[in-house]
């Protein structure tokens, strides 16, 4: 390997958003990084969140969407999940930071006397900390794609934009490029696409000292050449640097669309590089199988955050990955667990599989257990994740073992039958002993990150993982299955098929076609080109049993 490959001069691609939020900056960043990776480059990616929370770990799913957990136990923005899924790479805590983390770090350093009595200010101290974290994420990479959350014009984002401006000044034009994602709204009454909001957004960026080199124009329909020329002139970018990003039927189509729009040409030109040519044949094959699959299955998704499906983003994508690799469309039938409580299990009839995901709190729990019982008694393939596994154990204890008061200490701290309990000490990711109680702070006190799990010989869980005896999966939970009840449930047919340092990690029914619960979150390690084995097998078994039922 050449010295330049070992210690490359990192090139920075900053991605900002204008007009409004939720335009797809995360997908844009992931897509650009994917094309560069498939061109043979060593690519890193970073998400900056301007909110003042230290991390999203204690934020409501309705407020923020899903919390994505990295292998090293960081609770991060859901865009980190997109990055991992697109790039088929594990990222760490250094690939996502917030305003809260930046200020906390600066204030703690000031308290230790690290600034030698100086007055601490946004410029230079906060901005310098931001630049330090950006450079840290880019170490050893040929490219670092940096996504700035929020919208240009938000007061919270100003220090980060100043850091971008300073890095361009310090590193030079051949190492920094600015990509601005913006909306071209369609006025349906007139049938017109409007460029004025984009022009105003770019003007706002310029006032801060940043001129974008590439405009990503989000639109419901194709942009006429006249509008591209208008954007090119009004925003002072080359014509071929106006990249049209039409709504796509799947997010995995976006890198292919960007490749057709030739987005890598203006990037190579800015960085004074030869033509960049990605190899996307395998990616293209999988996208075709998403768009035109041979088979289909219907999976009942029994949850309680259904009004904001972003809360289950990684799991939804994991089902897509499994379907793509099986050439099967996964139809998700959304089943509100509270409606099942009040109206019964009728929505679960005629589905091919039942999935109960993770969650927190007692609301909707009875409905989830009714769904689990329905899957168990009717031999429907079932996958329970985190809370879903815990509820499967409680349902089994109540309805098979006859332990009427079986419960979780999360719902009833005084329950006489704590099937699920709060484990008060455990070894964390770094090998340190952690102690937690009901009075511990909510933030950062869960069992987080990647842990090893040993799988039981001859189990369906081990078969799902292609016979692997030891796997690594990610966790995000406070409560554990109580080993005190292990012997009783195993004698009745619900066996422990996975464990880690004495903790129950996976359960399965021995007299059922496919009924598995896992304490970990398999969705966090699923990728389009490398689907998670237990989710892939769940869809595969649902499809196989559907075909058996259809043919019989």
Curated annotation (Swiss-Prot):
Family: Belongs to the CTP synthase family.
Molecular function as annotated in GO: ATP binding; CTP synthase activity; glutaminase activity; identical protein binding; metal ion binding
UniProt-annotated binding residues for CTP: 21, 154-156, 194-199, 230
Residues of the active site: 386, 521, 523
Binding site for UTP: 21, 194-199, 230
Note: CTPSs have evolved a hybrid strategy for distinguishing between UTP and CTP. The overlapping regions of the product feedback inhibitory and substrate sites recognize a common feature in both compounds, the triphosphate moiety. To differentiate isosteric substrate and product pyrimidine rings, an additional pocket far from the expected kinase/ligase catalytic site, specifically recognizes the cytosine and ribose portions of the product inhibitor.
Glutamine amidotransferase type-1 domain segment(s): 298-548
EC number(s) from the headed UniProt entry: 6.3.4.2
Annotated protein name in UniProt: CTP synthase
Keywords of the record: ATP-binding, Glutamine amidotransferase, Ligase, Magnesium, Metal-binding, Nucleotide-binding, Pyrimidine biosynthesis
């Amino acid at each position: 390997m050449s010295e330049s490959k070992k210690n490359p001069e990192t090139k920075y691609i900053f991605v900002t958003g204008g007009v409004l939020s939720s335009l797809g900056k995360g997908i844009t960043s992931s897509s650009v990084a994917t094309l560069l990776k498939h061109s043979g480059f060593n690519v890193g990616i970073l998400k900056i969140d301007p909110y003042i929370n230290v991390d999203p770990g204690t934020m409501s799913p309705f407020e923020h969407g899903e919390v994505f957990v990295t292998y090293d136990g960081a609770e991060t923005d859901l865009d980190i999940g997109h990055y991992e899924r697109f790039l088929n790479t594990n990222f760490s805590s250094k690939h996502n930071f917030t305003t809260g983390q930046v200020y906390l770090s600066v204030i703690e350093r000031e308290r230790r006397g690290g600034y030698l009595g100086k007055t601490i200010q946004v410029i230079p101290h906060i901005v310098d900390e931001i630049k330090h974290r950006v450079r840290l994420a880019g170490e050893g990479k040929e490219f670092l794609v940096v996504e700035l959350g929020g919208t240009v014009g938000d007061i919270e984002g100003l220090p980060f934009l100043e850091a971008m401006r300073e890095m361009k000044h310090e590193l030079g034009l051949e190492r920094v490029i600015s990509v601005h994602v913006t909306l071209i709204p369609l006025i349906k009454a007139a049938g017109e696409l409007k460029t004025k909001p984009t022009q105003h957004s770019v003007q706002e960026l310029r006032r801060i000292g940043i001129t974008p080199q590439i405009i990503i124009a989000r639109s419901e329909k194709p942009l006429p050449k006249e509008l591209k020329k208008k954007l090119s002139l009004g925003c002072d970018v080359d014509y071929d640097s106006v990249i049209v990003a039409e709504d796509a039927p799947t997010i995995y189509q976006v890198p292919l669309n960007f490749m057709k729009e030739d987005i890598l040409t203006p990037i190579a030109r800015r960085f004074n590089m030869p033509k960049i040519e990605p190899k996307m044949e395998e990616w293209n094959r999988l996208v075709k199988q998403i768009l035109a699959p041979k088979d289909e299955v219907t999976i009942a998704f029994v949850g309680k955050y259904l009004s904001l499906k972003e809360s289950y983003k990684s799991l939804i994508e994991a089902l897509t990955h499994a379907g793509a690799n099986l050439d099967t469309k996964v139809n998700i039938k959304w089943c509100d667990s509270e409606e099942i409580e009040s109206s019964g299990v009728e929505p679960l009839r005629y589905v091919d599989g039942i999935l109960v995901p993770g969650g927190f709190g007692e609301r909707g729990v009875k409905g989830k257990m009714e769904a689990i019982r329905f899957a168990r008694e009717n031999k429907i393939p079932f996958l329970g994740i985190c809370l879903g596994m815990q509820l499967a154990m409680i349902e089994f204890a109540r309805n098979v073992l006859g332990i009427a008061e079986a419960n979780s200490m999360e719902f009833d701290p005084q329950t006489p039958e704590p099937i699920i309990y709060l484990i008060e000490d455990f070894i964390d990711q770094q090998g340190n002993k952690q102690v937690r109680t009901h009075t511990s702070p909510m933030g950062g006190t869960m069992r987080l990150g990647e842990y090893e799990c040993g799988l039981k010989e001859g189990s369906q869980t081990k078969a799902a993982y292609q016979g692997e005896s030891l796997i690594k999966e990610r966790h995000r939970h406070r409560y554990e299955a109580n080993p005190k009840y292990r012997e009783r449930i195993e004698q009745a047919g619900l066996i422990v098929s996975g464990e880690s340092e004495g903790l129950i990690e996976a359960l399965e029914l021995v007299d059922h076609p496919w009924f598995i619960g896992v304490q970990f979150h398999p969705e966090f390690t699923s990728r389009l080109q490398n689907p998670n084995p237990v989710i892939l097998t769940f869809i595969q078994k649902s499809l196989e049993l559907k075909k058996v039922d259809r043919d019989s």
